[in-house]
Swiss-Prot record:
This is Defensin-like protein 1. GO terms for biological process: defense response to fungus; killing of cells of another organism. The modification Pyrrolidone carboxylic acid is found at residue 1. SUPFAM superfamilies: Scorpion toxin-like. Belongs to the DEFL family. Keywords: Antimicrobial, Disulfide bond, Fungicide, Plant defense, Pyrrolidone carboxylic acid. SMART domains: Knot1. Forms oligomers in its native state. Possesses antifungal activity sensitive to inorganic cations. Disulfide bonds join 4-51, 15-36, 21-45, 25-47.
């Protein structure tokens, strides 16, 4: 199943913790996965959803 990335709607500020971002994406936003990705000008928490 293909996953599409979307910036987290609940994360604010710079993303410095992959696990925290992943847990927040999964628990709060019902995503499949999440990680800190560099999006200019800083690292953001990106959630991955089924397309």
């Amino acid at each position: 199943q293909k996953l599409c990335e979307r910036p987290s709607g609940t994360w604010s500020g710079v993303c410095g913790n992959n696990n925290a971002c992943k847990n927040q994406c999964i628990n709060l936003e019902k995503a499949r996965h999440g990680s800190c990705n560099y999006v200019f000008p800083a690292h953001k928490c990106i959630c991955y959803f089924p397309c």
